[in-house]
């Protein structure tokens, strides 16, 4: 299965099963990007005086949708109330999280600029909520298996787990427009 072929250059073939899926498989591509990404750009509406109240504000967060062998599509965060973005979320819990396939090797190998539509980007929009106690074990495993240093961060910063309850999945992975992926299709797809 080849993702695509341009100018005789092949990207991902059956010989490289860890590469991205074919671009036509939009739900699977979205899950692949969400699972492969270690960090993303979270955009909120700012409540901070230093950032002109009510303007968009973005911040980088380490994320995980589960351990390497168990991607769920649900994005988990480990955050502190000391972070401006977390303060923003208390006022307005809706946010957008953007990932770029440029984080991995694929776009570099294909010599795609991060803005090239063939270098896929995924934006998940939803409501940020604190992880409930019955889900804390999995959230911890998801985050600390992918970001082990986080488990040693200062307790005094009052770290806690959040997740994004998805409302919309937006994917651009090819020339000619974007795909809005139904949530059911997104969660049904596998990132592997």
PLM feature spans:
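Binding-site signature for planar aromatic cofactors or substrates
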Residues: 1-192
């Amino acid at each position: 299965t080849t993702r695509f072929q341009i100018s005789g250059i092949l990207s991902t073939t059956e010989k490289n099963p860890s590469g991205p899926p074919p671009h036509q498989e939009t739900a699977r591509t979205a899950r692949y990007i969400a699972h492969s990404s270690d960090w993303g750009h979270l955009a909120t509406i700012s409540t901070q005086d230093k950032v002109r109240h009510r303007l968009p504000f973005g911040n980088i967060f380490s994320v995980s949708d589960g351990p390497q062998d168990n991607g769920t599509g649900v994005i988990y965060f480990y955050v502190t109330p000391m972070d401006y973005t977390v303060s923003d979320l208390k006022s307005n819990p809706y946010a957008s999280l953007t990932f770029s396939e440029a984080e991995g090797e694929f776009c570099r190998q294909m010599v795609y600029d991060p803005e090239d539509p063939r270098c896929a980007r995924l934006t998940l929009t939803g409501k940020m909520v604190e992880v409930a106690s019955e889900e804390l074990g999995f959230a911890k495993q998801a985050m600390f298996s992918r970001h082990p240093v986080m488990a040693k961060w200062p307790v005094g910063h009052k770290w806690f787990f959040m997740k994004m309850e998805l409302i919309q999945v937006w994917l651009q992975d090819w020339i000619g427009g974007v795909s809005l992926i139904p949530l059911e299709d997104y969660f049904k797809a596998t990132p592997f």
